[in-house]
Amino acid sequence: MNSMPTFKFDQVGIWSELKLEIVEKYGAAYTAAFANEPRLKKYYVDAFSGAGVHISKRSGGTIEGSPARALKTSPKFDGFYFIDMDAQKTAHLKTICVGRSDVHIETGDASEYLTKVLLPTIDYGKYNRALCLFDPYGLHLEWRAMELAGKSRAVDMFLNFPVMDMNRNAIWRNPDAVPKDGIDRMNRFWGDDSWRSTAYVENAQGNLFGAPDVVKQSNEVIVSAFRERLR
């Protein structure tokens, strides 16, 4: 008889620990900024929430993830939305949030839930505001979700650009070798295929001695172009 796979917490390095601290401080600053506006409803949205607990590669011990930290924010948020595609992670997260009527946990595709269910309810005119943490495991977040959040005027986005997955699966030195699945994922993340003209430029040296026709741009150039696209 097959047993269920053992659940293991994600391991995080020092940079991820620092990122968690930054998000935690930003959350407190965000709610503090609206402290004198009681009519505003402030929501915290974590689109790739994880289990709420991580293992530190540095110490070997457990550390709180972004959801657990957000729940302790002072001044507090009025509601929390935690989303993750991994049912085991959301199951563990529910154990952390027992008794919290202000917490909503969703298992599934973040982009689908954000665009079809959650973001349409974050209405600027009804004094709703949201801090959205987009820290995808890879190229799992779609442009449609980011675009809707940006156009709402009610949402502040905190996006961790998935550079590693982008380089591993979509933007290679030889663009002709990239599999269709990688291209499709990048298209959904970017919103269209215009990333190609950003990621690759014509080789100024020409095609000498078998050199490639195009040259892959640096991560910094690509991320900067995406940042401008979000404006």
Which residue stretches match the model-derived regions?
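Class I S-adenosyl-L-methionine-dependent methyltransferase catalytic core
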Residues: 1-231
